[in-house]
Amino acid sequence: MYANSRKRSNVDVHRHPYVVYGSPFDLEPSRINQGVPVWKQEARDERNRKRFHGAFTGGFSAGYFNTVGSKEGWQPKSWKSSRNENKSVHGMTIDDIMDEEDRADQELSKVYTSKINTIDTSIPIDDPLLREFSNRDDSIGEKMLKNLGWNGHDFVISPFQGYYDDTKLTNQAYHGIGYQADDVFQLERKPVGMAKNLRGGFGSGVLNDDGIEDQDIYDLGAPKMRYDKSINITKKVASPFTPVKHTFLSKKDRSKGKSIIKSQNCSDGLPPLPGFVVVFNLQSPFQNNWFPPPTIPEGWEPKLFTNSQGFSQKKAQTSNERLPLFAEKSETNSNGEASLPSDVNHGVKEDEGSWQLIDIETAKNAMSRKDNPYNDERAGIYEIFLKAHLMNMPRLLRDIDSRHLLEFTQTASLYRPMSKNLSMRFVSSFEASTKKESINSHSETDDSILRRPRTVVTFIPERLLCKRFNVALPYGQEKQKRKNISSIENVPIIAEIENKSIDSIDTRKLNRPQDIEEKPKAPQTLFSAIFGDD
């Protein structure tokens, strides 16, 4: 049964798919130009060109194209005249000789076709002849049906459909994906029932054999060129073992002494059962090859490893035992005695009190307080922390968390005695005096400092400095050259120069009149003529 083949009218094709109900109302004037795209906002002429000249008619070309060299325009890097090239390249087109009327006629003469293929819609879907002449694109559903064998009318079954059906085959791919199968596992299979049929007789093809006509004179045989290192030499590949089938020997064969394969012993060293043969040798690739260990020469002793008993007998060093190691690396004083820095000496504690986080006085003050700073389960742990320092029992701190130990140490440090706080913040006068004495003794004994050159320079202030302090220039505008007085070995002369009084300076230089050329001042009449009121 065919569908209606009548062509649809243009009214049905271009009919709006929705039903309009009611009368549309006009938008507000302020909302008419809303949502206009950018390409509609550009000023173009009737030929869709941006060629408006003049500030009041668009100003696009006048403000952009004709502003070469300005900030808003295009700045050429190199200029080259194209006067001669334009003559050869330029050619007349039909648009150059057409006016507005010609363009209007050309626009009317154009033929527009609808994108909707109305002819194809009237073709029945089951007519194969008309479907061949149709030129529309197939839909996605039709493409999927064609891939399944649909030709437009019914499904065509391929003759090779049964050839590609999955069959139950034995899995022999033991080598895995991405690897190549080994020839060892490909056991040879003898054809069953073929050897009995190939016994006697010959065919009639021997009588009809011409011999010469079927022979190719250009036949050179199989290609002898191979991608091997050797040519015309068949290289024998030695297999690790020869695959053998399980074979049962009858009594008749055993009596005649026939044996297909020489029997071998099993892995346990015993011969196989009568009538059976071992398939794999003992030296199969599945067994690991164990090589004998290297022979150790006589008298050899290891150098990198010591006796294992030495590790258990060795004890950890205490802080007092490690102290000489740090002292050797420290600087030595003038007497040759090793001296540690102050921070190292302060951190070194005795072995007995190395575990203590607070001193005993701080623990007593914190224990004497009746109000416990903690109200939860930490209150009991805090008392155990203080009792461990008072009773000198470090084993009580083993079960306390490290975070609680840090928190209890900061809490107990608030009850540290005042003398302890002052000693940590200030330095005693005895230590300060010893440092000064060490500096003085070092300066007195060091003769290299006295042998350095010293200079005595007369102070000549700058002119701006004298002006700021309202002091006259001591030497005038001409600055004298500074005289360097150096003495390396004569120390008494240096002392005399340093103790020289100010009176020894030459006073004649101070009392010398200033040689400043003063310019004549302008007369008063000039100022009155300029700034005076008439």
Swiss-Prot record:
Residues 310-346 are annotated as: Disordered. One of its GO terms (biological process) is mRNA cis splicing, via spliceosome. Residues 310-321 have a biased composition (Polar residues). The keyword DNA damage does not apply. Its main location: cytoplasm. It comes from the Eukaryota. Pfam families: DUF1604. This is Uncharacterized protein C20H4.06c. It comes from Schizosaccharomyces pombe (strain 972 / ATCC 24843). The lineage of its organism: Eukaryota, Fungi, Dikarya, Ascomycota, Taphrinomycotina.
